[in-house]
Curated annotation (Swiss-Prot):
Segment forming the signal sequence: none
Protein origin, superkingdom: Archaea
Molecular function as annotated in GO: sulfurtransferase activity
NCBIfam families recorded: ATP-dependent sacrificial sulfur transferase LarE
InterPro entries referenced in this protein's UniProt entry, alphabetically: LarE, Ni-pincer_cofactor_biosynth, Rossmann-like_a/b/a_fold
Family: Belongs to the LarE family.
Protein name, entry field: Uncharacterized protein MJ0830
Length: 252
């Protein structure tokens, strides 16, 4: 009953604010932007835009496309070749680039507003992208209506919406200020894809040059049981040592 009241209130708030407006949604394929896209597409005309860069994995793109088709979302994929500088402000620089692209799309196709899936909890975390959001006047309905991550997960589960594993860009696998090439990104992307043969959920391969650190949210024994093949694969890619982070990676 509490869930139903919360959902009805959220839908009414979205309808009141966005009815008859054309909306571009910054769509990453994560649960926040996915749920927002589903709810807004029931109310008005929407265009979900996924921006594919060399540091966004093909796995993330494919998942985003699959869910867009599953929930009948109007999706546009924009591919760019630029790799932002791997500096402490990389998240801000990335979001700034993304929001600039989305704003140009809004103006080009006469949409009224650009929104993203920022939720209420995000406002209280250290998120450099929030500064870029403010600079481009990007709307955040979940944050505006005080909908946090727990609310989003609850609504998604109750509506039987598939909850994708939490993904971050491939640049987060590297330490700040290290110069990153296309080859570096491809190496990590291919190794994470290789590990999906053994485990489910979120996977991270941290690159410390000669050392690779594997993080997963699935059962660690699935990696340990296949260690010989995994070690060989990683050494084929140039790593001298392969370690497992014993602390389970948590998506949510």
């Amino acid at each position: 009953m509490v869930f139903l009241k919360k959902l009805i209130k959220l839908k009414n708030n979205l309808k009141e604010k966005f009815k008859n407006k054309k909306i571009i949604i910054a769509y990453s394929g994560g649960i926040d932007s996915l749920l927002l896209s589903i709810l807004l597409s029931e109310i008005t005309e929407t265009l979900c835009i996924f921006i594919k860069t060399p540091y966004i994995s093909e796995w993330s793109l494919n998942n985003a496309i699959i869910n867009a088709k599953k929930y009948n979302l109007n999706l546009k994929v924009i591919k760019i070749d630029k790799i932002i500088k791997n500096v402490p402000e990389r998240c801000y620089l990335c979001k700034k680039m993304f929001f600039e692209i989305l704003t140009k799309e809004k103006e080009k196709y006469n949409y009224d507003v650009v929104v993203d899936g920022t939720n209420y909890d995000d406002l209280f975390e250290d998120r450099p992208g929030l500064r870029a959001k403010e600079e481009f006047n990007i709307g955040s309905p979940f944050a505006d209506f005080k909908i946090g991550k727990k609310d989003i997960l609850e609504i998604a589960k109750e509506l039987n919406i598939n909850i994708p594993p939490k993904e971050t860009c491939l640049l987060t696998r590297f330490e700040f200020n290290r110069e990153i090439s296309i080859e570096d990104l491809k190496k990590i992307e291919e190794l994470e894809e290789f590990l999906r043969n053994y485990v489910k959920g979120a996977i991270r391969v941290r690159d410390y040059k000669n050392l690779a650190v594997i993080e997963i949210e699935d059962d660690l024994s699935k990696i340990i049981n296949e260690k010989e093949e995994i070690i060989k694969k990683f050494k084929d890619y140039g790593f001298k040592k392969v370690c497992i982070n014993l602390e389970i990676y948590r998506s949510y």
